[in-house]
Amino acid sequence: TPEAEALVIGVAPAGGNLPETWIEDIEDAIRAGCDVVSGLHVFLGEEDHWQSLAEQHGARLFDVRKSPTDDQLRVGDGSVDDVDADVVLTLGTDCAVGKRTTTFELYQAAQADGLDAGWVATGQTGIMVGAHEGVVVDRVPADFIAGVVEDLVSTVAADHDLVFVEGQASLTHRAYSGVTLSILHGAWPDAVVLADEPVREGRTHFERFQVDGVEKELRLIEDLSN
C-alpha cells in the first residue's frame, strides 16, 4: 500500500474553528511527513504551532480559503461578454444540492466527448479537486465578487471552447443570495444548469426558511440575466 503524501481537510465546520478532536490526527499526519491541504477558515500556515511542526518534519501547509490579493480585486465591467467560449453556470434551489458535483461531472463528460472544456470553482473543494481556476467567494469583498469571477471565466475561456462555472447557494436564499447573484453577473453564462432536491422543503441549516422551488428560481435567473 503506498504511503499517503498529503492530508486534505475538505470540511469547513460551522463557525470555521478547528475542532479539538481533529488536532491529534493533523499532528500525526504532519509528523509522518504529510503535507496538509486545508479548506478551514482558520489558516494553519499562519499559526506558530503548525508552522513549527511542519518545518520540523518537512511538511507543507496549504490554506486554500485565503482571500484574493488586492491586485485580483476589481469591480465587474462586462468584459466577460467578449469571450469566445460558451459559458455554462451551475446554479441551484438551495445550498448543498450538488452544484459542484454537477459542474465537475459536466466538465468530465464534455472532455470524454472530445470537447475542449475547462471549469471554474467558486469554493475551496472545487479548487482542491483541480479546477482550472478558482476562488473561495466567501473570502471576497462583496463589491468585487462579480469582477473576480469575470476574470477567472475570461482566463479559462482564453484556453478552452467551453467553460463550466460552479455556482453557490441560490437566488431565493435569504442568507446567501447576494453571492449567487454576483456569480451569475460575473459569469454571465450562455446557459444555466439548475440543481434541485425535489423532496427538500426546509433549507439546509436554515429550517425556518423554505425552499422556493424550481419555477421561481428559474424565473429569477432569467429575469436577472436578461
What are the functions of these language-model segments?
Residues 107-143:
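N-terminal phosphate/diphosphate-binding loop that engages ATP/GTP or pyrophosphate donors
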Residues 22-26, 107, 180-181, 218:
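Generic hydrophobic/aromatic pocket-lining and core-packing "Φ" positions
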Residues 2-5, 32, 56-59, 83-86, ...:
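Short coil/turn connectors at secondary-structure junctions
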Residues 1-86, 91-92:
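N-terminal Rossmann-like NAD(P) cofactor-binding subdomain of oxidoreductases
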Residues 17-19, 96-104, 128-129, 171-176:
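Short glycine/serine/threonine-rich phosphate/pyrophosphate-binding segments
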Residues 10-12, 39-41, 64-66, 91-94, ...:
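Fold-independent oxyanion-binding glycine-rich loops
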Residues 74-119:
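Walker A (P-loop) phosphate-binding motif
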Residues 42-44, 48-52, 63-71, 76-78, ...:
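Conserved catalytic-core segment of NTP-binding enzymes
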